[in-house]
Amino acid sequence: MTGSMLKRLFAAAALLLAATLLSPAQTGTWSGELDVQGTRLPIVFHLDEENPTVDSPAQGARGIPVEVIRTSSGGVTIKVPSIGATYEGLWMIKRIVGTFRQMGASLPLTLTPGEEKLNRPQTPKGPFPYAQEEVSFSNGDAVLRGTLTLPEGYTRNTPALVMVTGSGLQNRDEEFFEHKPFAVIADALARSGIATLRYDDRGFGESTGDIVNCTTEDLKNDALAGIRLLRERFDKVGVIGHSEGGTIALMLAAEAKADFVVSLAGMVVSGKETLLWQNRVALTATGVPAETVDVYCKALSEVFDACMAGEPLPSVGGYGLTAALAQNLAAVSAQLQTPYLKYFIALDVRPLLGRISCPVLAFNGTKDMQVEPWSNLGALRDGLPDNARKQVEAIEGVNHLFQHSRTGMVDEYREIEETIAPEVLDKMVRWLLCCE
Protein backbone atom coordinates (compact mmCIF):
# COMPACT_ATOMS: atom_id res chain seq x y z
CA MET A 1 0.00 0.00 0.00
CA THR A 2 1.36 3.44 -0.89
CA GLY A 3 2.21 6.12 1.64
CA SER A 4 -0.37 8.46 0.13
CA MET A 5 -3.01 5.75 0.15
CA LEU A 6 -1.99 4.78 3.70
CA LYS A 7 -2.67 8.31 4.87
CA ARG A 8 -6.12 8.10 3.28
CA LEU A 9 -6.68 4.83 5.12
CA PHE A 10 -5.68 6.63 8.32
CA ALA A 11 -8.31 9.24 7.55
CA ALA A 12 -10.95 6.58 6.99
CA ALA A 13 -9.91 4.62 10.05
CA ALA A 14 -10.16 7.76 12.14
CA LEU A 15 -13.88 7.62 11.47
CA LEU A 16 -14.18 3.89 11.08
CA LEU A 17 -14.60 3.34 14.79
CA ALA A 18 -16.75 6.42 15.22
CA ALA A 19 -18.74 4.93 18.04
CA THR A 20 -18.37 4.61 21.76
CA LEU A 21 -18.71 1.65 24.04
CA LEU A 22 -20.98 2.67 26.86
CA SER A 23 -22.27 0.90 29.94
CA PRO A 24 -22.32 1.94 33.61
CA ALA A 25 -18.93 0.23 34.05
CA GLN A 26 -17.48 1.65 30.86
CA THR A 27 -17.24 5.39 31.44
CA GLY A 28 -14.17 7.59 31.18
CA THR A 29 -11.46 7.35 28.54
CA TRP A 30 -10.58 4.10 26.77
CA SER A 31 -7.98 3.62 24.07
CA GLY A 32 -6.55 1.02 21.75
CA GLU A 33 -4.57 0.66 18.55
CA LEU A 34 -5.41 -0.61 15.11
CA ASP A 35 -2.67 -2.38 13.20
CA VAL A 36 -2.88 -0.96 9.67
CA GLN A 37 -0.36 -2.98 7.68
CA GLY A 38 2.27 -2.71 10.40
CA THR A 39 1.53 0.90 11.37
CA ARG A 40 -0.15 1.52 14.71
CA LEU A 41 -3.20 3.78 14.61
CA PRO A 42 -4.34 4.91 18.09
CA ILE A 43 -8.07 5.26 18.78
CA VAL A 44 -9.32 7.03 21.91
CA PHE A 45 -12.90 6.85 23.20
CA HIS A 46 -14.34 9.36 25.67
CA LEU A 47 -17.31 7.60 27.22
CA ASP A 48 -19.55 10.40 28.36
CA GLU A 49 -23.08 9.11 28.87
CA GLU A 50 -24.76 12.00 27.07
CA ASN A 51 -22.23 12.90 24.38
CA PRO A 52 -19.80 10.03 23.74
CA THR A 53 -17.03 10.81 21.26
CA VAL A 54 -14.02 9.21 19.61
CA ASP A 55 -10.62 10.66 18.67
CA SER A 56 -8.00 9.53 16.20
CA PRO A 57 -4.88 11.37 17.41
CA ALA A 58 -2.90 10.19 14.39
CA GLN A 59 -5.15 12.23 12.11
CA GLY A 60 -6.03 15.07 14.46
CA ALA A 61 -9.66 13.92 14.34
CA ARG A 62 -11.21 14.67 17.73
CA GLY A 63 -14.63 14.84 19.32
CA ILE A 64 -16.42 12.80 16.66
CA PRO A 65 -19.99 12.06 17.88
CA VAL A 66 -20.85 8.37 18.06
CA GLU A 67 -23.78 6.01 18.77
CA VAL A 68 -23.96 2.62 20.45
CA ILE A 69 -26.23 -0.43 20.88
CA ARG A 70 -25.63 -2.57 23.99
CA THR A 71 -26.76 -6.03 25.01
CA SER A 72 -27.49 -7.34 28.48
CA SER A 73 -24.73 -9.94 28.09
CA GLY A 74 -22.00 -7.30 27.84
CA GLY A 75 -21.87 -7.17 24.07
CA VAL A 76 -21.87 -3.94 22.14
CA THR A 77 -22.59 -3.13 18.50
CA ILE A 78 -21.50 0.24 17.21
CA LYS A 79 -22.78 1.49 13.89
CA VAL A 80 -21.44 4.34 11.78
CA PRO A 81 -23.98 4.72 8.95
CA SER A 82 -22.13 7.58 7.27
CA ILE A 83 -19.21 5.32 6.33
CA GLY A 84 -20.90 1.92 6.41
CA ALA A 85 -18.87 0.68 9.38
CA THR A 86 -19.77 -1.56 12.31
CA TYR A 87 -17.86 -2.34 15.49
CA GLU A 88 -18.74 -5.33 17.64
CA GLY A 89 -17.12 -5.71 21.05
CA LEU A 90 -17.40 -7.58 24.33
CA TRP A 91 -16.79 -6.16 27.79
CA MET A 92 -14.08 -8.23 29.54
CA ILE A 93 -13.89 -6.50 32.98
CA LYS A 94 -10.74 -4.39 32.40
CA ARG A 95 -10.76 -4.35 28.65
CA ILE A 96 -13.11 -4.37 25.70
CA VAL A 97 -12.29 -6.84 22.93
CA GLY A 98 -13.82 -6.39 19.51
CA THR A 99 -13.57 -6.15 15.75
CA PHE A 100 -14.51 -3.43 13.32
CA ARG A 101 -15.65 -4.08 9.79
CA GLN A 102 -15.93 -1.88 6.74
CA MET A 103 -16.18 -2.74 3.05
CA GLY A 104 -15.37 -6.37 3.75
CA ALA A 105 -12.27 -5.61 5.83
CA SER A 106 -11.98 -6.66 9.49
CA LEU A 107 -9.42 -5.53 12.08
CA PRO A 108 -9.19 -6.44 15.77
CA LEU A 109 -9.31 -3.70 18.40
CA THR A 110 -8.84 -4.10 22.14
CA LEU A 111 -9.53 -1.13 24.42
CA THR A 112 -8.02 -0.50 27.85
CA PRO A 113 -8.66 2.34 30.34
CA GLY A 114 -6.83 5.63 29.89
CA GLU A 115 -4.92 7.29 27.08
CA GLU A 116 -1.24 7.28 26.23
CA LYS A 117 0.23 10.78 26.12
CA LEU A 118 2.99 11.23 23.56
CA ASN A 119 5.80 13.71 24.14
CA ARG A 120 5.84 16.42 21.48
CA PRO A 121 8.25 19.08 22.82
CA GLN A 122 8.08 21.32 19.73
CA THR A 123 4.31 21.86 19.86
CA PRO A 124 3.87 25.61 20.52
CA LYS A 125 2.61 26.63 23.95
CA GLY A 126 1.32 30.10 24.89
CA PRO A 127 1.46 32.88 25.70
CA PHE A 128 2.43 33.82 22.15
CA PRO A 129 4.15 37.03 20.99
CA TYR A 130 1.80 37.21 17.99
CA ALA A 131 -1.93 37.30 17.25
CA GLN A 132 -4.12 34.50 15.88
CA GLU A 133 -7.48 34.98 14.15
CA GLU A 134 -10.06 32.39 13.21
CA VAL A 135 -11.07 32.94 9.58
CA SER A 136 -13.12 31.31 6.84
CA PHE A 137 -13.10 31.50 3.04
CA SER A 138 -14.86 29.69 0.22
CA ASN A 139 -14.15 27.80 -2.97
CA GLY A 140 -17.45 26.97 -4.63
CA ASP A 141 -19.51 24.93 -2.19
CA ALA A 142 -16.52 24.30 0.09
CA VAL A 143 -16.11 26.51 3.15
CA LEU A 144 -12.58 26.36 4.55
CA ARG A 145 -11.98 27.38 8.16
CA GLY A 146 -8.57 28.05 9.57
CA THR A 147 -6.18 30.15 11.60
CA LEU A 148 -4.47 33.34 10.47
CA THR A 149 -1.26 33.91 12.44
CA LEU A 150 -0.16 37.54 12.51
CA PRO A 151 3.28 38.67 13.72
CA GLU A 152 3.53 41.61 16.05
CA GLY A 153 3.46 44.93 14.20
CA TYR A 154 2.53 43.40 10.85
CA THR A 155 1.78 45.67 7.86
CA ARG A 156 0.73 45.18 4.24
CA ASN A 157 4.42 44.63 3.46
CA THR A 158 4.66 41.65 5.82
CA PRO A 159 5.24 38.43 3.83
CA ALA A 160 2.35 35.98 4.17
CA LEU A 161 1.92 32.35 3.17
CA VAL A 162 -0.93 29.90 2.67
CA MET A 163 -0.04 26.49 4.14
CA VAL A 164 -1.23 23.44 2.14
CA THR A 165 -1.27 19.95 3.65
CA GLY A 166 -0.30 16.66 2.05
CA SER A 167 -2.62 13.96 0.73
CA GLY A 168 -5.34 12.57 2.95
CA LEU A 169 -7.73 14.37 5.27
CA GLN A 170 -5.88 16.52 7.79
CA ASN A 171 -6.55 19.44 10.08
CA ARG A 172 -4.95 22.87 9.85
CA ASP A 173 -1.94 21.73 11.91
CA GLU A 174 -1.35 18.79 9.53
CA GLU A 175 -1.61 16.71 12.68
CA PHE A 176 -0.24 13.19 12.44
CA PHE A 177 0.42 10.96 15.47
CA GLU A 178 -0.01 14.08 17.64
CA HIS A 179 2.74 15.90 15.76
CA LYS A 180 1.56 19.32 14.57
CA PRO A 181 4.13 20.38 11.96
CA PHE A 182 2.10 23.26 10.52
CA ALA A 183 1.57 24.72 13.99
CA VAL A 184 5.32 24.46 14.62
CA ILE A 185 6.13 26.13 11.29
CA ALA A 186 3.53 28.88 11.76
CA ASP A 187 4.94 29.62 15.21
CA ALA A 188 8.52 29.84 13.91
CA LEU A 189 7.51 32.09 11.03
CA ALA A 190 5.39 34.41 13.19
CA ARG A 191 8.28 34.87 15.61
CA SER A 192 10.36 35.93 12.59
CA GLY A 193 7.80 38.43 11.26
CA ILE A 194 6.02 36.24 8.69
CA ALA A 195 2.23 35.71 8.58
CA THR A 196 0.57 32.39 7.73
CA LEU A 197 -2.86 30.98 6.97
CA ARG A 198 -3.43 27.31 7.73
CA TYR A 199 -6.81 25.63 7.34
CA ASP A 200 -8.63 22.34 7.82
CA ASP A 201 -8.88 20.30 4.63
CA ARG A 202 -12.26 20.37 2.89
CA GLY A 203 -14.69 17.94 4.50
CA PHE A 204 -12.55 17.64 7.64
CA GLY A 205 -12.40 19.38 10.99
CA GLU A 206 -14.35 22.63 10.80
CA SER A 207 -14.22 22.83 6.99
CA THR A 208 -16.95 21.62 4.66
CA GLY A 209 -16.92 20.48 1.06
CA ASP A 210 -17.11 17.43 -1.18
CA ILE A 211 -14.29 14.96 -0.57
CA VAL A 212 -15.75 12.07 -2.58
CA ASN A 213 -15.49 13.68 -6.01
CA CYS A 214 -12.64 16.12 -5.46
CA THR A 215 -9.21 15.95 -7.12
CA THR A 216 -5.88 17.69 -6.59
CA GLU A 217 -7.20 20.42 -8.89
CA ASP A 218 -9.99 21.15 -6.39
CA LEU A 219 -7.49 21.19 -3.53
CA LYS A 220 -5.35 23.62 -5.53
CA ASN A 221 -8.35 25.92 -5.92
CA ASP A 222 -9.00 25.70 -2.17
CA ALA A 223 -5.48 27.02 -1.64
CA LEU A 224 -6.05 29.70 -4.29
CA ALA A 225 -9.08 30.89 -2.32
CA GLY A 226 -6.76 31.23 0.68
CA ILE A 227 -4.34 33.30 -1.41
CA ARG A 228 -7.19 35.65 -2.33
CA LEU A 229 -8.07 36.04 1.34
CA LEU A 230 -4.48 36.95 2.23
CA ARG A 231 -4.21 39.45 -0.64
CA GLU A 232 -6.92 41.50 1.02
CA ARG A 233 -4.39 42.29 3.78
CA PHE A 234 -0.92 41.61 2.38
CA ASP A 235 0.97 42.63 -0.76
CA LYS A 236 3.37 39.66 -0.87
CA VAL A 237 1.66 36.27 -0.68
CA GLY A 238 3.27 32.88 -1.15
CA VAL A 239 2.48 29.21 -0.60
CA ILE A 240 4.17 26.62 1.56
CA GLY A 241 3.09 23.05 0.90
CA HIS A 242 4.05 19.63 2.21
CA SER A 243 3.99 16.50 0.03
CA GLU A 244 0.96 16.88 -2.27
CA GLY A 245 0.75 20.43 -0.88
CA GLY A 246 4.23 21.06 -2.31
CA THR A 247 2.96 19.91 -5.69
CA ILE A 248 0.03 22.30 -5.35
CA ALA A 249 2.43 25.14 -4.48
CA LEU A 250 4.32 24.54 -7.73
CA MET A 251 1.07 24.37 -9.72
CA LEU A 252 0.03 27.75 -8.30
CA ALA A 253 3.46 29.21 -9.04
CA ALA A 254 3.17 28.05 -12.66
CA GLU A 255 -0.16 29.91 -12.87
CA ALA A 256 1.50 33.07 -11.46
CA LYS A 257 -0.82 33.01 -8.45
CA ALA A 258 1.96 33.04 -5.83
CA ASP A 259 4.80 35.50 -5.27
CA PHE A 260 7.08 32.79 -3.83
CA VAL A 261 6.68 29.11 -2.92
CA VAL A 262 8.16 26.59 -0.51
CA SER A 263 7.89 22.91 -1.42
CA LEU A 264 8.52 20.49 1.45
CA ALA A 265 8.85 16.93 0.11
CA GLY A 266 6.77 17.96 -2.88
CA MET A 267 6.02 15.51 -5.68
CA VAL A 268 7.40 16.73 -9.01
CA VAL A 269 7.48 13.50 -11.03
CA SER A 270 4.16 11.88 -11.91
CA GLY A 271 1.76 10.38 -9.42
CA LYS A 272 2.17 7.04 -11.18
CA GLU A 273 5.96 7.07 -10.70
CA THR A 274 5.57 8.12 -7.07
CA LEU A 275 3.09 5.38 -6.19
CA LEU A 276 5.15 2.70 -7.95
CA TRP A 277 8.24 3.75 -6.01
CA GLN A 278 6.32 3.84 -2.72
CA ASN A 279 5.03 0.32 -3.31
CA ARG A 280 8.46 -1.00 -4.19
CA VAL A 281 9.98 0.53 -1.05
CA ALA A 282 7.18 -0.69 1.24
CA LEU A 283 7.17 -4.25 -0.10
CA THR A 284 10.95 -4.54 0.03
CA ALA A 285 11.00 -3.25 3.61
CA THR A 286 8.57 -5.97 4.69
CA GLY A 287 10.78 -8.71 3.26
CA VAL A 288 8.89 -9.51 0.07
CA PRO A 289 11.28 -11.24 -2.38
CA ALA A 290 12.66 -9.02 -5.14
CA GLU A 291 11.11 -11.14 -7.92
CA THR A 292 7.68 -10.85 -6.32
CA VAL A 293 8.12 -7.09 -5.90
CA ASP A 294 8.97 -6.80 -9.60
CA VAL A 295 5.88 -8.76 -10.63
CA TYR A 296 3.59 -6.74 -8.37
CA CYS A 297 4.97 -3.39 -9.54
CA LYS A 298 4.66 -4.49 -13.18
CA ALA A 299 1.03 -5.40 -12.53
CA LEU A 300 0.40 -2.12 -10.75
CA SER A 301 1.99 -0.16 -13.59
CA GLU A 302 -0.23 -1.90 -16.14
CA VAL A 303 -3.31 -1.18 -14.02
CA PHE A 304 -2.33 2.50 -13.86
CA ASP A 305 -1.67 2.65 -17.61
CA ALA A 306 -5.05 1.11 -18.41
CA CYS A 307 -6.79 3.58 -16.12
CA MET A 308 -5.05 6.58 -17.70
CA ALA A 309 -5.89 5.28 -21.19
CA GLY A 310 -9.54 4.78 -20.27
CA GLU A 311 -9.28 1.05 -20.96
CA PRO A 312 -10.66 -1.87 -18.90
CA LEU A 313 -8.34 -2.73 -16.02
CA PRO A 314 -6.37 -5.99 -16.30
CA SER A 315 -7.61 -9.00 -14.36
CA VAL A 316 -5.96 -9.22 -10.96
CA GLY A 317 -5.76 -12.99 -11.24
CA GLY A 318 -3.54 -12.91 -14.30
CA TYR A 319 -0.26 -12.12 -12.57
CA GLY A 320 0.31 -15.13 -10.31
CA LEU A 321 0.46 -12.99 -7.17
CA THR A 322 0.07 -14.25 -3.63
CA ALA A 323 -3.42 -13.96 -2.17
CA ALA A 324 -2.44 -10.94 -0.07
CA LEU A 325 -0.87 -9.04 -2.97
CA ALA A 326 -3.73 -9.95 -5.29
CA GLN A 327 -6.16 -8.58 -2.71
CA ASN A 328 -4.14 -5.38 -2.43
CA LEU A 329 -4.04 -4.98 -6.21
CA ALA A 330 -7.80 -5.48 -6.34
CA ALA A 331 -8.22 -2.76 -3.70
CA VAL A 332 -6.09 -0.37 -5.76
CA SER A 333 -8.14 -1.19 -8.86
CA ALA A 334 -11.31 -0.34 -6.94
CA GLN A 335 -9.83 2.97 -5.73
CA LEU A 336 -8.97 3.87 -9.32
CA GLN A 337 -12.69 4.35 -9.86
CA THR A 338 -12.49 7.48 -7.68
CA PRO A 339 -11.87 10.86 -9.33
CA TYR A 340 -9.03 11.61 -6.90
CA LEU A 341 -6.79 8.65 -7.72
CA LYS A 342 -7.54 8.80 -11.45
CA TYR A 343 -6.34 12.40 -11.48
CA PHE A 344 -3.41 11.76 -9.14
CA ILE A 345 -1.68 9.00 -11.12
CA ALA A 346 -1.68 11.20 -14.24
CA LEU A 347 -0.58 14.34 -12.41
CA ASP A 348 2.89 15.48 -13.53
CA VAL A 349 4.09 19.03 -12.87
CA ARG A 350 7.35 18.73 -14.84
CA PRO A 351 5.83 20.33 -17.98
CA LEU A 352 4.72 23.30 -15.84
CA LEU A 353 8.08 24.14 -14.28
CA GLY A 354 9.31 26.28 -17.18
CA ARG A 355 6.46 28.72 -16.55
CA ILE A 356 7.52 29.48 -12.98
CA SER A 357 9.12 32.90 -12.54
CA CYS A 358 8.78 33.42 -8.77
CA PRO A 359 11.37 32.33 -6.16
CA VAL A 360 11.22 28.63 -5.24
CA LEU A 361 12.57 26.88 -2.15
CA ALA A 362 12.42 23.08 -2.23
CA PHE A 363 13.54 20.59 0.41
CA ASN A 364 13.34 16.81 0.34
CA GLY A 365 14.72 14.50 3.03
CA THR A 366 17.36 11.93 2.14
CA LYS A 367 15.42 9.35 4.17
CA ASP A 368 12.01 10.14 2.67
CA MET A 369 10.30 6.83 1.89
CA GLN A 370 7.12 8.38 0.48
CA VAL A 371 8.39 10.90 -2.07
CA GLU A 372 11.71 9.81 -3.59
CA PRO A 373 14.09 12.73 -3.01
CA TRP A 374 16.62 12.52 -5.84
CA SER A 375 14.32 12.21 -8.86
CA ASN A 376 12.03 14.97 -7.58
CA LEU A 377 14.81 17.41 -6.67
CA GLY A 378 16.55 16.62 -9.96
CA ALA A 379 13.37 17.31 -11.91
CA LEU A 380 13.07 20.69 -10.19
CA ARG A 381 16.67 21.66 -10.88
CA ASP A 382 16.33 20.68 -14.53
CA GLY A 383 12.85 22.08 -15.08
CA LEU A 384 12.94 25.50 -13.44
CA PRO A 385 14.17 28.33 -15.70
CA ASP A 386 17.89 29.09 -15.46
CA ASN A 387 17.17 32.66 -14.39
CA ALA A 388 14.75 31.60 -11.65
CA ARG A 389 15.69 32.29 -8.06
CA LYS A 390 15.71 28.77 -6.67
CA GLN A 391 17.15 26.84 -3.76
CA VAL A 392 16.74 23.09 -4.23
CA GLU A 393 18.27 21.04 -1.44
CA ALA A 394 18.34 17.54 0.04
CA ILE A 395 18.23 17.59 3.84
CA GLU A 396 20.44 14.86 5.22
CA GLY A 397 18.99 12.23 7.55
CA VAL A 398 15.35 13.36 7.69
CA ASN A 399 12.19 11.52 6.63
CA HIS A 400 9.06 12.59 4.77
CA LEU A 401 7.94 14.65 7.80
CA PHE A 402 11.44 16.18 8.13
CA GLN A 403 12.13 14.35 11.38
CA HIS A 404 15.63 13.00 12.00
CA SER A 405 15.06 9.28 11.62
CA ARG A 406 16.79 5.92 11.48
CA THR A 407 15.07 4.28 8.51
CA GLY A 408 12.61 6.90 7.26
CA MET A 409 9.77 4.36 7.26
CA VAL A 410 6.23 5.37 8.26
CA ASP A 411 6.24 3.21 11.38
CA GLU A 412 8.86 5.52 12.95
CA TYR A 413 6.75 8.69 12.71
CA ARG A 414 4.88 8.03 15.95
CA GLU A 415 7.94 7.04 17.98
CA ILE A 416 10.05 10.08 17.08
CA GLU A 417 9.53 12.99 19.50
CA GLU A 418 10.91 15.62 17.12
CA THR A 419 8.20 17.16 14.94
CA ILE A 420 10.45 18.92 12.42
CA ALA A 421 14.21 19.29 12.25
CA PRO A 422 15.34 22.71 13.59
CA GLU A 423 17.72 23.21 10.65
CA VAL A 424 14.78 22.96 8.26
CA LEU A 425 12.92 25.68 10.14
CA ASP A 426 16.04 27.86 10.22
CA LYS A 427 16.76 27.48 6.50
CA MET A 428 13.13 28.20 5.66
CA VAL A 429 12.96 31.35 7.78
CA ARG A 430 16.23 32.75 6.43
CA TRP A 431 15.18 32.11 2.82
CA LEU A 432 11.76 33.71 3.27
CA LEU A 433 13.23 36.81 4.90
CA CYS A 434 15.58 37.20 1.94
CA CYS A 435 12.54 37.23 -0.38
CA GLU A 436 11.38 40.54 1.07
Residue ranges of each PLM-predicted region?
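Central antiparallel beta-sheet cores of small beta-barrel/beta-sandwich binding domains
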Residues: 26-91, 97-102, 122
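Accessory cap/linker subdomain of secreted extracellular hydrolases
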Residues: 264-355
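Alpha/beta-hydrolase active-site loop
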Residues: 213-232
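N-terminal cap/lid segment of alpha/beta-hydrolase-fold proteins
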Residues: 116-156
